[in-house]
From Swiss-Prot:
It comes from Mus musculus (Mouse). Belongs to the amino acid-polyamine-organocation (APC) superfamily. Cationic amino acid transporter (CAT) (TC 2.A.3.3) family. It comes from the Eukaryota. PANTHER family: CATIONIC AMINO ACID TRANSPORTER 4, INNER MEMBRANE TRANSPORTER YGJI-RELATED. The gene is Slc7a4. GO terms for molecular function: amino acid transmembrane transporter activity; carboxylic acid transmembrane transporter activity. It is found in: Membrane. Its main location: membrane. This is Cationic amino acid transporter 4. It is a multi-pass membrane protein. Involved in the transport of the cationic amino acids (arginine, lysine and ornithine). Glycans are attached at N146, N151, N195, N221. One of its GO terms (cellular component) is membrane.
Length: 635
């Protein structure tokens, strides 16, 4: 081998580093954070993350430009689609009650580099999302005062004509972010109390809108004379669904907060289900009364609800709507500031991000450094940048996280379950017994070997029909089927999204491609379903695996393909920056990297029964104990 060139063994070792998994610890209730959040706290955090400015702006935009009164169907379909992703988060959040959300879920099932990239994108999602909401909050308040704040700033500082920068510095948006960061740094209890207050006001205002809206409803506004219920047809409903889907992306704050929940195994799935139901009900009912109060084609997209009440002679109701809108945006702001430092804390605690962000304040028991640093960064973005061009960039990071979490659910279900971290030795008997361990290099012989089927093996009832799969080692056929499932989902999504006109295929070619992609997708799904899964856990589990996460993967892929190419270019650039951070810092400081040298020198332990209560433990060296270092290979 030429000097200086890495050997095959070194390359394999490098790939193992990239794909190493974080051990899935079932007993993970111990934490340096304070477990003080109840189911109600988590539910209101989720509602606050989902029911924000979208209710007051998005509803009117989709109704007027995309779906008409059928906007309620768009919200319904979007809620069902979000439910698929929410179920995946619920299972992981209950089973792994640690902070980190999609980052942690990917780390324990798919590998380190994938987890870092997901965490890196979620970080940007919260950073830009919080800044965008702060600017929307500032703009809404400025509009109430007839844009006097903007006029004052422009008259004293002038108008900026620099690309990517705002036309004027938004000091109000930056100020509200700094104030909110100060409150969030006081502890989870203070953040929860603020969120309770704003969420309660927001829900009361929503209830007021629904009740008064139904009183003022005119069924004639859905008649054929006004364009009918679905003036844009089925395609308009689907286009509205793609937009409405982003109204439900805030539920992951619940999973990110699971390490501070009192009873996460029960509270996390319950809070996700309740908050998603409340948010879906609010969006569907508000969109219904909005299009019943006034004709859909006369709506003002910028302030649809306030304008609708004004048209019906209830201008005073516009003030109540404004109060509800401000409170709703406050809850979204708190949700972003609450979640972002905890994602960074999880990455720093694992060694993949700078260690300073893993520090927890001894009194408030929150990652105060991350809160203040990223609160200031968020304030700078809101102060200086024009965020309109970056808003769509948020969706791709969210959808990618949803896709990886759904894939991780399939991986986890077909993996062999990890045993307890401190297994009790069984009483000695006449035969050797075997214990599994987190490490591949440690084996305790002490539990009787059985021939029971393991996760990843073909179901016994199907062996006569699928015998060619029975020869595969456990998990091999599952891994191939999952890879083919994801590839076929991308192919099928391309066919469905771009259509015959964009692909420039003859009709028969388009139909053939659709049939082949669909058949491969279904076949890989059936192969996955033909294998054993883990036994039912004590915590919440998704029904119909692998069907439910597979549908989530397909849907998320379709929505990602509908994004513009500029969004994809920005996304690729951000990924490249993340790879520089990972290879420059994360891969060398990873806690799993520090664990590996110990694992390489760990002996195998065999328990020999002695016929008494005492057992003799002897160290048995592996067959190839000392790894040979090859030239050009550096650890």
């Amino acid at each position: 081998m030429a000097r200086g060139l890495p050997s095959t063994a070194c390359l394999a070792r490098f790939c193992q580093k990239l794909n190493r998994l974080k051990p899935l610890e079932e007993s993970s209730m111990e934490t340096s954070l304070r477990r003080c959040l109840s189911t109600l706290d988590l539910t209101l955090l989720g509602v606050g993350g989902m029911v924000g400015s979208g209710l007051y702006v998005l509803t009117g935009t989709v109704a007027k430009d995309m779906a008409g009164p059928a906007v309620l169907l768009s919200f319904l379909v979007a809620a069902v689609a979000s439910l698929l992703a929410a179920l995946c988060y619920a299972e992981f959040g209950a089973r792994v009650p640690r902070t980190g959300s999609a980052y942690l879920f990917t780390y324990v099932s798919m590998g380190e580099i994938w987890a870092f990239l997901i965490g890196w994108n979620v970080l940007l999602e919260y950073l830009i999302g919080g800044a965008a909401v702060a600017r929307a909050w500032s703009g809404y308040l400025d509009a109430i005062f007839n844009h006097s704040i903007r006029n004052f700033t422009e008259s004293h500082l002038g108008v900026w004509q620099v690309p990517f920068l705002a036309h004027y510095p938004d000091f109000l948006a930056a100020g509200i972010l700094l104030v909110a960061s100060a409150f969030v740094s006081c502890g989870a209890r203070v953040s929860s109390w603020l969120n309770h207050t704003f969420s309660a006001i927001s829900l009361i205002v929503i209830l007021f809108i629904i009740v008064l809206g139904f009183i003022l409803a005119r069924p004639h506004n859905w008649s054929a004379e006004e364009g009918g219920f679905a003036p844009f047809g089925f395609s308009g409903i689907l286009a509205g669904t793609a937009t409405c889907f982003y109204a439900f992306v805030g539920f992951d704050v619940i999973a990110a907060s699971s390490e501070e929940a009192k009873n996460p195994r029960w509270a996390v799935p319950m809070a996700i289900a309740i908050s998603l139901s409340l948010a879906a009900g609010a969006y569907i009912l508000v969109s219904t009364v909005l299009t019943l109060m006034v004709p859909w084609h006369s709506l003002d997209p910028d302030s649809a609800l306030a304008d609708a009440f004004y048209r019906r002679g209830y201008s005073w109701a516009g003030f109540i709507v404004a109060v509800g809108s401000i409170c709703a945006m406050n809850t979204v702001l708190l949700s972003n500031l609450f979640s972002l430092p905890r994602i960074v804390y999880a990455m720093a605690a694992d060694g993949l991000f700078f260690q300073v962000f893993a520090r927890v304040h001894p009194r408030t028991q929150v990652p105060v450094v991350g809160i203040l640093v990223f609160g200031v960064l968020m304030a700078l973005l809101a102060l200086l940048l024009d965020l309109e061009a970056l808003v769509q960039f948020l969706s791709i990071g969210t959808l990618l996280a949803y896709t990886f979490v759904a894939t991780s659910i399939i991986v986890l279900r077909f993996q062999k379950a990890s045993p307890p971290s401190s297994p009790c030795l069984a009483s000695p008997g006449p035969t050797a017994k075997k214990y599994d361990s987190f490490s591949d290099h440690i084996q305790l012989v002490g539990a009787e070997q059985t021939s029971m089927s393991e996760p990843g093996q073909l179901r016994p009832a199907l062996k006569p029909f699928l015998g060619f799969l029975d020869g595969c080692s456990p998990g091999t056929a599952v891994a191939w089927a999952l890879g083919i499932l994801v590839a076929s989902a991308i192919s099928l999504a391309c066919v469905l999204v771009f259509g015959n006109s964009d692909l420039h295929l003859p009709q028969w070619g388009y139909v053939l491609l659709l049939v082949i992609s669909g058949a491969v997708f279904l076949s890989s799904l059936l192969v996955l379903g033909a294998h054993q899964q883990q036994k039912k856990q004590d915590t919440f589990q998704i029904p119909l695996v692998p069907l439910t996460p597979a549908l989530s993967i397909l849907l998320n892929t379709c929505l990602m393909l509908k994004l513009s190419y500029l969004t994809w270019l920005r996304f690729i650039f951000w990924l490249l920056v993340g790879l520089v951070v990972y290879f420059g810092y994360g891969i060398w400081h990873s806690k799993e990297n520090q664990r590996e040298p110990l694992e390489l020198t760990t002996a195998h332990y065999v328990v020999f029964p002695s016929g008494s209560l005492e057992e003799t433990v002897q160290a048995v060296q592996p067959s190839s104990q000392s790894p040979v270092r090859e030239s050009g290979c550096t650890e």
